[in-house]
Curated annotation (Swiss-Prot):
Protein's gene: WDS
WD repeats: from-to residues: 222-261, 267-306, 310-353, 355-394, 395-434, 438-480, 483-523
Gene Ontology CC, one term: cytoplasm
Domain CTLH: 49-107
Protein name: WD repeat-containing protein WDS homolog
Major localisation: cytoplasm
Length: 523
């Protein structure tokens, strides 16, 4: 055993053999292979549990609190007084709880008087301990439940083991944690990782381009002019497109990921350049730079409402929903109209107008409904907390054409006419954005989006007729997808299928992209 303490494993000689065997034994026990674990302990003469940890476990589970205190005093040295006091506090709390639950009030008070000095507890801490016990759910009326008591003791043991210093106790499931950490490190360096499936331990992790949408699987032809906007619904079961032919189309995503036309929405008199799905996917908003805002029923394709007064030409450039699917907000390309919040019946709830409100380029509401992000024509991004009314302003140096929020609402991206996409954090901790480049944008409105597993990717259209994909860890393009013959105006990643992407182009088509071929060389 003494010699074994100095033996090492691995090609780098960094792994101590006795520690490696000990966590192997722990793993076998946790997986239920008790006989195998015991056999390994016998053969290696290396025990998973030390004498102190085994003794403590027995005392806790049997409720021998005096013995628990003694072993804890022995385990913690003078440099760990705070940790020792925390451990003793947990033990006394469980002890008092059990006495009070059984009705032994006098015994509980006696323990409190006797043991309080050990913890150097003042009146405040004693009062807190008493309150913790009296108001705990375990003190609810009813007979003493032995199963509950044993369960509470097991939980106490877990908490104590977190406090006990190494190597007396090994952290729970240590081998699983080490392996999982190693796998996660490999995943973090994998630019194509796009699946939550379990990974193989037989080889180092490395994904190919078959994990992301990089091949055209379907071309949708229904619009009669340029397609300016595309967006998957929140459930991923529908797709909406908007065109300069003055129509919008609702498409159905089938179970095999094929897409078919569901409704053509014909009521606009001018080009449609923006759509927005309600969070429950029952309603769709459509609008355009020279158009009014319209609300459609997704199931029937029927126009439910036209917002504003048509006679005054209340044009809307962008719109967004609140999480309840009953309120929406729209921004006008007319500065005098500003930003308006409506209900779905067309009643104005709130408006932001005045000289401080320039032309609205794009806007969005965070998934939690707490903040509204607005992009203005003066190169400003304003983030308004709708509850506190606190507003944060970000000034860009170049004109901004579009905005998109990540699925978790923590980040947003903006496309700039200088051929860059800027990634900002919503919390405002970053002083500078991450800048992604490689695509072409100088004359037209180009839109990008987050997508893939955990919003790990960005996709964007481009004036060179390509679709560009970046991994958030690299500001240079990961993939450049060819297929369209004219400017790609907008892209949308299916929020429920990380391997499905849609793109809309001036060539009057919508392309659906699926997983690429794993053996195809990268562009």
């Amino acid at each position: 055993m003494e010699n074994g303490l100095w033996e090492v494993l691995g090609s780098k000689g960094l792994l101590k053999k006795h520690e490696f065997i000990r966590i192997l034994v722990q793993c076998l026990y946790s997986l239920g292979f008790k006989n195998s674990a015991s056999c390994l302990e016998f053969e290696s003469k290396i025990l998973y549990k030390t004498a102190d940890s085994e003794f403590l476990e027995k005392q806790v589970l049997s409720g021998n609190w005096d013995s628990c205190v003694q072993v804890l005093d022995r385990i913690f040295d003078n440099s760990m007084d705070d940790t020792r006091n925390t451990a003793l506090y947990l033990v006394f709390k469980q002890c008092l709880l059990e006495y009070l639950k059984r009705g032994d009030v006098s015994l509980a008070l006696n323990v409190l008087r006797k043991q309080a000095p050990l913890l150097r507890m003042g009146k405040e801490k004693i009062h807190r301990l008493a309150c913790d016990i009296v108001y705990s759910k375990e003190m609810e009326s009813g007979e003493v439940d032995n199963c509950l008591v044993l369960d509470l003791r097991r939980k106490l043991l877990v908490e104590l083991e977190k406090l006990i210093p190494l190597p007396i106790v090994i952290p729970e499931r240590r081998l699983e944690h080490l392996v999982e950490t190693a796998v996660m490190d490999q995943i973090d360096t994998c630019m194509y990782h796009n699946s939550c499936d379990a990974v193989s331990l037989y080889k180092d992790h490395c994904c190919g381009r078959d994990q992301i949408p990089s091949e055209t699987v379907q071309i949708l032809v229904a619009h009669k002019n340029e397609v300016w906007f595309v967006q998957f619904s929140n459930s991923g079961k529908y797709l909406a497109t908007a065109s300069s032919d003055c129509t919008a189309i609702i498409w159905k995503v089938l179970d095999d990921n094929k897409v078919e036309l569901k409704h053509t929405l014909e009521s606009h008199q001018n080009p449609v350049s923006f759509v927005s799905w309600s969070p429950d996917d029952t309603k769709l908003l459509t609008c355009g730079n020279a158009e009014v805002l319209k609300l459609w029923d997704v199931d029937t394709g029927v126009l439910r409402h036209t917002f504003g007064n048509n006679n005054t030409g209340f044009t809307v450039s962008s719109c967004a929903w609140f999480p309840d699917s009953t309120r929406l907000v729209c921004g006008s390309s007319d500065p005098e109209r500003g930003i308006v919040m409506w209900d779905t019946d067309g009643n104005e709830i709130k408006a932001w107008r005045g000289t401080r409100i320039p032309k609205v380029v794009d806007l969005a509401v965070t998934p939690d409904g707490e903040s509204m992000i607005t992009v203005f024509s003066d190169k400003e991004i304003r983030i308004l907390n709708l509850e506190t009314k606190v507003e944060r302003v970000i000034s860009e140096e170049q004109p901004i054409t579009s905005l998109s929020i990540s699925g978790d609402g923590k980040f947003f991206i903006v496309n700039l006419s200088c051929q860059e996409i800027h990634l900002w954090d919503l919390a405002g901790e970053w002083k500078q954005p991450l800048k992604f480049s490689g695509h072409r944008q100088s004359k037209y409105v180009i839109r990008s989006c987050f997508g893939g597993l955990d919003s790990s990717f960005i996709a964007s259209g481009s004036e060179d007729s390509q679709v560009y994909i970046w991994n958030l860890k690299n500001t240079k393009p990961l993939e450049v997808l060819s297929g369209h013959s004219m400017t790609v105006n907008c892209v949308s990643w299916n929020p429920k299928n990380p391997r499905m992407l849609a793109s809309a182009s001036d060539d009057q088509t919508i392309r659906i992209w699926g997983p690429g071929k794993p053996n195809k060389p990268l562009n």
